[in-house]
């Protein structure tokens, strides 16, 4: 059998199937299997840390062919390695195979299986397996229940998860901080913060002291739900209980404050970190740089950027892009380009967001040609433009009167639909607005017709753009006809549509019609 295993891998290597074959050096390492009569126990003891998936499957095959059969303990060691590779369905199938062969599970194997059911989004199977475990005489422990409850959380079955916690307590199994932390973290990551807080209170009632990991999970969850005030209160309660926050705890709240426009609070938290001798990391600095940029304080953002380097925290592409974005928003595109070049000199390549930010920046200062050069540079470097890149570039070209170039870019997008950059409704709206803005109504109507042929979901924004274009071109009668047809299309005019139409009527001297439409707008409750 061992020789057959060895020969199998040698054949794979000879055939050039390097993806499935073991490396030659690894093959030589495995030759001791033959010399030592395939001592799988030695392999289990020494070789699992570097085992690849295909190797693990081959080892399992070898083990089931061995006589006498290995113990369930040995099999479980291997199954645990496969589970760590996130091959949960494979573990479940291999366990079924063992049962068919008459190899009985132990509690550790049952817990491993329970976890695999849950991680592969099959909590209903995990729940029924719990009953099977108990029939086999295994008493579920805290590991069993932690896996099962976590599985219910991952499957958004919150009532069952909470019920399982109560059932566990009734069975005399005392929850510990690890179990609560695992479940609370899962709840927070899936947006069930209220359930997490309820569980947190329950834990306190059982006299279990929370740790920094649990607090950080809750702070993160609250911040992600927009409840930064509650997160801040939780942080204060944490410090009062002499539980020291870590950099991840502070980062969650600093980032939340920045996004809420509470930059002074974010700065105060940063200063508090320093006072507590908690070293900021790149995420901390990047959040603060974003905050300075949002406040228009780009010089302070740059100072923070260089302070980061002096602290041994070297900026990555995200940090550079944040600073570039700040300068672009302040229309200091030359400074933004200097930062971009500095980033390149340090061996960092801008990503799609970096280039899109620069394209938008040059568009806003009326430099469409430079924006297009940046786009060309992006493509030549192999950085893939996404739909937002194209939309930003189209807006830049149209806004600056480069309609022909915009149409060329649009046609390029249509050709590259298979690359995942097909025009979306926003692309069409940008182009339609640009064409109408530049007096190209006929071309706009052709593009609009293309949208209809593609059976796109045309909404009120698109119709309003066309109505505005018609009014601008003096085609008010056409605009009125299109406006009146909206109800039959299932589209309701908004205040912008009404205002556009009323203004168009006034410009044509149709004051009575404009007043009638104004009254209708009021009657329809549009404001």
Curated annotation (Swiss-Prot):
It comes from Arabidopsis thaliana. This is Pentatricopeptide repeat-containing protein At5g41170, mitochondrial. PPR repeats lie at residues 36-70, 71-105, 106-140, 141-175, 176-210, 211-245, 246-280, 281-315, 316-350, 351-385, 386-420, 424-458, 459-493, 494-527. Keywords: Mitochondrion, Repeat, Transit peptide. It is found in: Mitochondrion. Belongs to the PPR family. P subfamily. It comes from the Eukaryota. The keyword DNA damage does not apply. PANTHER family: ATPASE EXPRESSION PROTEIN 3, EXPRESSED PROTEIN. One of its GO terms (cellular component) is mitochondrion. The lineage of its organism: Eukaryota, Viridiplantae, Streptophyta, Embryophyta, Tracheophyta. It holds the Pfam family PPR_1.
